[in-house]
Amino acid sequence: MLAWLATLRSAMLHALRREALQGPVLGDADAVAAYLFAAMAHEPVEQLRVLYLNARNRLLLDETAIEGSVNVAPIYPREILRRSLEMGATALILAHNHPSGDPKPSREDIRLTRLVATAGEALDIRLHDHLIVARSGWISLRAGGYL
C-alpha cells in the first residue's frame, strides 16, 4: 500500500510539475505555487528549493539546494548565486517549507530573501519571488510586500 501511495504521489508531482514549469514559469504563478506546495508542504524538515530560470523565464533547473532540520534550513546566498552563474540563470524563484504548518515568514526569512535579491541584482540575476509553503497554505513574499 505504501509503495502504491508513493507511486501515486510521484505521478501527481510529475503532472503538476509539467503543468507549472513547461512554459514560462511566471505565466501561471498559481500553478507554480501548487506544484511547490505539493512537493514540499508535508516534508518533515525544512528544505530550500531553487527554480533557476533563463532570460525567457523558462526552467533551467529545479533543485533542492538545502535540507535543514525541523525548524531551520540555512540559506547561503553566495551558494545560490554561484549555482545561478554556473547554470547561466538570469532569474530565480526560491521556495522553502515550514514543517510547523504556518507559512508566515520569519524575520530571518525576510532578511535572507532581501539579501539574495540585492546580491543577485549586482550579478544581473533577478529574484522573482520567494514562496513559503506549509500544510495550511503558502505565502508569496513578493505579493506580501517583503520583496
Protein language model regions, located:
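Short hydrophobic alpha-helical segments used for membrane anchoring or interfacial signaling
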Residues: 51-54
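Short loop/turn motifs at secondary-structure junctions and domain boundaries
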Residues: 41-44
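Short loop/turn microsegments at loop-to-beta-strand junctions
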Residues: 47-49, 128
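Helix-hairpin-helix
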Residues: 1-9
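Long, charged amphipathic helices and adjacent flexible linkers at domain junctions
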Residues: 12-33
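Active-site-proximal loop/helix of nucleotide/amide-processing enzymes and allied scaffolds
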Residues: 4-5, 34, 56, 66, ...
